[in-house]
Swiss-Prot record:
Domain of life: Eukaryota
Organism: Drosophila melanogaster (Fruit fly)
Chain positions with Phosphoserine modification: 26, 30, 660, 667, 671, 675, 679, 687, 691, 696
Acidic residues: bias regions: 692-702
Protein name: Glycogen [starch] synthase
Keywords for this protein: Cytoplasmic vesicle, Glycogen biosynthesis, Glycosyltransferase, Phosphoprotein, Transferase
Role this protein plays: Transfers the glycosyl residue from UDPG to the non-reducing end of alpha-1,4-glucan. In larval skeletal muscle, isoform B is required for the formation of autophagosomes during starvation and during cloroquine-induced vacuolar myopathy.
InterPro entries: Glycogen_synth (IPR008631)
A Pfam family the protein falls into: Glycogen_syn
EC number: 2.4.1.11
Family the entry assigns: Belongs to the glycosyltransferase 3 family.
Compartmental location: Cytoplasmic vesicle, Autophagosome
Annotated metabolic or biological route of this protein: Glycan biosynthesis; glycogen biosynthesis
An example Gene Ontology biological process: response to sucrose
């Protein structure tokens, strides 16, 4: 059992805020917002300032960093325009759909640098990324430089004493990509200097931003070759941290005790660890995505981050403004259809009094908190039986794992329900025709004449087909190695078998949700909108996009103070629970207390009536601005400015005089009753007293708009 304890991060930096009151919440802003810099690169062009962003996931959908880079592309392009270029490996299967190939215009140092590398035999693809913003792209074909791998490794050994195993293909590819990018940037700088001199421009100022250790090789090469380029390195999760947590170690209690070299060596990743640590220490500016990851990096990589760069979202993509409540109702009805089919023969609960909870992500049973989620559901089941027997919770676990096929019982249920619906529709049409004909003749319809024996026989056949002796399955697929599967083993241990007496029903869906799925028929985004609560009690989560996506879609969620998202919300919202963000303490209390707290949160949510849930969803959706890249992108700009000033001391960014944190702070809604914590001096943005009727007017209006009395 993991003891759950971590450490708070002290920040004595005094930050001044301009208080701006709003009738829904208090908003405290630091001096600048990224929107202030949206000029499509006009200022950057005049300053001859260039920004290169390097990641393995650029136009290459292979992980969470792809979401970060892709969603940030729009605001990055709005800020930097043609002075921005993104770089990564060329993967043909992804590039076909992600990239529009085209050459850079003549007289552009980018084109000159590309042609210079092509003359050396390197294959380079240029164009634009087919995402919002359409940033410029340079993708490097790793295979075209594989013949120089031994030379690259030799230089890495001579200058850094890092040896790369011959059989580690992933690291070999990272070495090739890193050297290709470093050579390109070196050539680009030379051409940019010449171009500036010929056109009487100021000297070029170049920033290269590298994400994760695979891209960090390029940073190491630039610094060891003494190329005058400002560098930023961002780690989204430390390499060693992932391995340690995957092994169920008591991670946060032992961060300062790990012998990092020994631990990396035992896991045969010492060379990768050295590359990550080398990039961390050689970068002019080092950033992490959250303070808790920063603390992890401080102990495992031995450098404290200079700036925290939280992950944002392109909120415009999820934005539904006044429609999100209606979208919830539409999506919920589609989930209702699944529930009718999956639980056929056992639908003894009212779907209007049924709540849908879900957990989703990579199948990391302990790291994602699935262990305590299932345990807390067992306790919730007991509490609901005692306190609210008319309320049912259906808990979905969406974790992709190896399966053999769909569960036959689940498929049969959907076929039976479809047959019943078709039969009822046919009978309904026949009854309607008979009623019309009877009325047309001037007679009052008789119930016995309307519903005939043939109709009753058809209905009875369908009802007999719906009878089942077994309980509804807990999984929609036949899971390979199901006797060892951690989710199924935990469900068995907690006796959550979907019996008639259980008020918590379990559905394990071991596959990503898509609109072509024959069971659900909806994609993940629509599924989230249809649920009532997302539960993500993670033990190791450097950021956590799943609860963030719930928030911008107006769906309340449970997170923890060991996730980057949870820490961020704790820091920026004085009473997160009022806004539908429930934060489980996995730092300072033991596992048993964390499970109890999670079950209490879920029970508290289950007690809410429909009106209260609608009001809470409205409050949750109001946090969207806090998670938008237009808000959080300012931290990336701050990191670039700091790197530029390290390499070019004369560089001054007049507009960058803003605080380093707390871009937005939300206080308690005025309609929420005060609590003792709101008076503590440590609580951010204490609530300002307002009229008690202030939110009630909004609630009535919201309900009226939705047609709910």
């Amino acid at each position: 059992m993991r003891r759950q304890q971590s450490y708070r991060f002290e920040d004595n930096e005094s930050t001044s805020y301009a208080l701006r009151m709003n009738r829904r919440f208090s908003r405290v802003e630091s001096g600048a917002d990224l929107k202030d810099y949206f000029d499509r690169g006009d200022i950057a062009s005049r300053e001859n300032r260039w920004n290169f962003e390097v990641a393995w996931e650029v136009a290459n959908k292979v992980g969470g960093i792809y979401t970060v880079i892709r969603s940030k592309a729009y605001v990055s392009t709005e800020e930097m325009g043609e002075q921005l270029c993104m770089m990564g490996p060329y993967k043909e299967h992804c590039a076909r759909t992600e990239m529009e190939e085209m050459e850079f215009p003549r007289g552009n140092p980018l084109l000159d640098a590309v042609n210079s590398l092509r003359s050396r035999g390197y294959k380079i693809h240029t164009g634009r990324w087919l995402v919002d913003g359409n940033p410029q792209l340079i993708l490097f074909d790793i295979g075209s430089a594989a013949w120089k791998l031994d030379q690259f490794k030799s230089e890495m050994w001579e200058k850094c004493h890092i040896g790369i195993p011959h059989l580690d293909i992933e690291t070999n590819d990272a070495i090739i990509l890193g050297f290709m990018i470093a050579e390109f940037l070196e050539e680009f700088r030379n051409f940019a200097v010449t171009y500036s001199q010929n056109n009487e421009l100021s000297a070029p100022r170049i920033v290269a931003h590298f994400h994760e250790w695979q891209a960090g090789v390029g940073l190491i090469v630039l610094r060891t070759r003494l190329v005058e380029i400002a560098t930023v390195f961002t780690t989204h999760a430390t390499l060693l941290g992932r391995y340690l947590c995957a092994g169920n170690t008591d991670f946060y209690n032992n961060l300062d005790k790990f012998a990092v070299d020994e631990e990396a060596g035992k896991r045969q990743i010492y060379h990768r660890y050295c590359l990550e640590r080398g990039a961390t220490h050689l970068a002019h500016v080092f950033t992490t995505v959250s303070e808790i990851t920063g603390y992890e990096a401080e102990h495992l990589l031995k450098r404290k981050p200079d700036i925290i760069t939280p992950n944002g979202l392109n909120v415009k993509k999820f934005s539904a403004i006044h429609e999100f409540q209606n979208l919830h109702a539409v999506a919920k009805e589609k989930i209702n259809e699944f529930v009718r089919g999956h639980f056929y023969g056992h639908i003894d609960f009212d779907l209007d009094k049924t709540l849908y909870f879900f957990i989703a992500g990579r199948y990391e049973f302990g790291n994602k908190g699935a262990d305590i989620f299932i345990e807390a559901l067992a306790r919730l089941n007991a509490m609901l039986k005692h306190e609210k027997p008319d309320t049912t919770v259906v808990a979905f676990l969406i974790f992709p794992t190896k399966t053999n096929n769909f569960n036959v019982d689940s498929l049969r249920g959907h076929a039976v329900i479809k047959q019943l619906r078709d039969t009822i529709n046919n009978v309904q049409q026949a009854v309607g025709k008979r009623m019309f004909d009877t009325c047309l003749q001037g007679n009052i319809p008789n119930a016995d004449d309307l519903l005939q024996k043939d109709d009753l026989v058809k209905i009875k056949r369908c009802m007999f087909a719906m009878q089942r002796d077994s309980m509804p399955p807990v999984t929609t697929h036949n899971v390979a190695d199901d006797w060892n599967d951690p989710v199924l083993s935990s469900i068995r241990r907690c006796h959550l078998f979907n019996s008639r007496h259980d008020r918590v029903k379990m559905v394990f869906h071991p596959e990503f949700l898509t609109s072509t799925n024959p069971l659900f028929g909806i994609d993940y985004e629509e599924f989230v909108r249809g649920c009532h609560l997302g539960v993500f009690p993670s033990y190791y989560e450097p950021w956590g996009y799943t609860p963030a996506e719930c928030t911008v879609m107006g769906i309340p969620s449970v997170t923890t103070n060991l996730s980057g998202f949870g820490c961020f919300m704790e820091e920026h919202i004085s009473d997160p629970k009022s806004y539908g963000i429930y934060i489980v303490d996995r730092r300072y209390i033991g596992l048993e207390n964390s499970v109890q707290q999670l079950s209490s949160f879920m029970m508290e949510f289950s007690r809410l009536n429909r009106r209260q849930r609608i009001i809470q969803r409205n409050r949750t959706e109001r946090l969207s601005d806090l998670l938008d890249w237009r808000t959080l992108g300012i931290y990336y700009r701050q990191a670039r400015v700091k790197a530029l000033q390290a390499v070019y001391p004369d560089y001054v960014d007049e507009l960058s005089l803003y605080g380093s944190k707390n871009n937005l702070i939300f206080s308690r809604p005025h309609s929420e009753p005060p609590s003792p914590t709101s008076s503590r001096h440590t609580t951010p943005a204490p609530s300002v007293h307002g009229s008690d009727d202030e939110d009630s007017v909004d609630e009535e209006t919201e309900l009226k708009e939705l047609g709910i009395k």
